[in-house]
Structure formats: C-alpha cells, structure tokens
Amino acid sequence: MKLCGFDVGLEQRLFLIAGPCVIESAQLQMDVAGQLREITARLGMPFIFKSSFDKANRSSGSSYRGPGRDKGLEILARVRRELALPVLTDVHTEDDIAAAAQVVDVLQTPAFLCRQTDFISAAARCGKPVNIKKGQFLAPHEMHNVIDKARAAARQAGLSEDRFMACERGASFGYNNLVSDMRSLAIMRASGAPVVFDATHSVQLPGSQGSRSGGQREMVPVLARAAVAAGVAGIFMETHPDPDRALSDGPNAVPLKHMQALLETLVALDGVTKRHGFLENRFGA
C-alpha cells in the first residue's frame, strides 16, 4: 500500500503516526511536530503527524474537546505546510469527513464507530487513506468485515480499494480496563490491510477516574515492543511534552523526551522481525 509517498506493509520499514491527542495550541503542535520530524528523519522512519480538532467521545461533557473543526484544521494545515509533513486527524461525523479531507493526508475513524456502516462507507469514499480503528468490543476477525465494507464503498465510487489500514487499540477486559492480545495482529493481517498498533490507547483505563480516563503510560514501551515483534506495518503513539498537564489522554501519553529512545528500540526490533519473516504463515503448509 502506498501512503503519503512511502510504501507500508510487512516487507517495508515501520512507520509512525504520532502527536498530541488533541490540539491545544498552534505552538504546541508546531513544537511537537518539529521535534518528531527531527527524530524520525535521523532514524529513517516514515512519519505522519496526528492530532484531533474535536474529541467527541470524552468521558465527561465538561472535558476539553479541542479548538473545533475550522480552527483545528487551520492549525493542521499550518503544520503540513510549514513543516512539510503529512498529517492525520480523526473524524466523528460525515460532515467532518468532507471538511477534513480537504486539508489532511489521512483520515482516522474512531473505534466506537467501526460498526457504523454509513460512516465507514462515507470515509472510504472521500478519496483519502483511512486508518480504521478496531472497536474495543470487537473480535479481531470481525475487522475483516469492516475492511470489506470500506473496500466495497471505494469500489462503488470508482476509487482504489488499497487505501485502508486496520488499527488495534486493545479490547475491553471487564470494567475500566483494556488488554492487548498480540494474536489479534496476525488475525487482522489476514484481511490484507496493513495493520497499525495503537500503543497508547491500548494502555488507557477508560473511565477509571470517574469523570475522565486513566492510563498506564509506563506500559506503552512494553506493548509497543511486543506489537513490533509480532509484526505490524505501523505504530501509533500519542505524545506530549508534559503529559500530566495534557488536556486529553495525558495518563497514557508518551513523554516527548522519551520518544527518541523508544523509537530507536522499535526501529531496531522491526528490522530483526521483518528480516527473519513470519514463520506462523507457514504453519498451515
């Protein structure tokens, strides 16, 4: 699959989707994007900057949601223009899809909306690559159906069917907890879509703090290493210079100062994993 000018897949180097959870200010976006650009350039790692203009699924109605669509897209356009970076943002309504597709390079659909056929189909018809997040309530093999819906919508619109990624972000494990089953990555790969692992939302503790979600950011490196060893096309991580003061998802964000060390490990591990291939693919032979 071609994505933002580079190839993605199990025979290609690991790519990164990263940035603050939500747009807090234009300066923060520029600072974080600039630092990530420098780190990934040194590592030879393809990079897509991400951030959200509206967090429509916050735990509390009083929580900060973002600057709104118009202002948020304006800031993302600035990052794209001034730093020459591809950008990704998530969309929550069909109106968002049309507006965001005019500005960003990649769209992302929320995990909670992965079963909404009309929404997934609308995203698939926008002409942009789409990172489709697996719902916390979905078995990994059910993502094949979601990818098939997107491909069918693209086909009916006369567009390429090779523009969709499947993103794992953990599965509900009782109340206020998620678990990551690394088998899901291999199962989702069978859809033929590149698989991305969301290492930060996978350590979220949804709603565990009453009016907001908690998280175990110290476990991000653990799950990220495991996912890259299992074999993925890309890794998704939210990061912030000061996670304890972040306006959204701080408890599961990677401190920006640790991103280089973590990415160095992941790039090295990805090279070993992909160089030796995937023995599991031959077990049925």
From Swiss-Prot:
Give UniProt keywords alphabetically: Cytoplasm, Lipopolysaccharide biosynthesis, Transferase
Give the residue spans that cross the bilayer.
none
Q: Which PANTHER family match?
A: PHOSPHO-2-DEHYDRO-3-DEOXYHEPTONATE ALDOLASE
Name the pathway it acts in: Carbohydrate biosynthesis; 3-deoxy-D-manno-octulosonate biosynthesis; 3-deoxy-D-manno-octulosonate from D-ribulose 5-phosphate: step 2/3; Bacterial outer membrane biogenesis; lipopolysaccharide biosynthesis
Q: Which GO terms describe its molecular function?
A: 3-deoxy-8-phosphooctulonate synthase activity
Question: Keyword Nucleotide-binding on this protein?
Answer: no
The coding gene here is kdsA
Taxonomy-wise, where does this protein's organism fall, top ranks first? Bacteria, Pseudomonadati, Pseudomonadota, Betaproteobacteria, Burkholderiales
Q: What is this protein called?
A: 2-dehydro-3-deoxyphosphooctonate aldolase
InterPro entries from the entry?
Answer: Aldolase_TIM (IPR013785), DAHP1/KDSA (IPR006218), KDO8P_synthase (IPR006269)
Sorted alphabetically, the Gene Ontology BP terms of this entry are: keto-3-deoxy-D-manno-octulosonic acid biosynthetic process
Its domain of life? Bacteria
One Pfam family matching this protein: DAHP_synth_1
What is its subcellular localisation?
A: Cytoplasm
Q: What is its EC number?
A: 2.5.1.55
GO cellular component terms, alphabetically, are:
cytoplasm
Which cysteines are disulphide-bonded?
A: none
Q: Which reaction does it catalyse?
A: D-arabinose 5-phosphate + phosphoenolpyruvate + H2O = 3-deoxy-alpha-D-manno-2-octulosonate-8-phosphate + phosphate
tRNA-binding as UniProt keyword: no
Instruction: Say which family it is in.
Output: Belongs to the KdsA family.
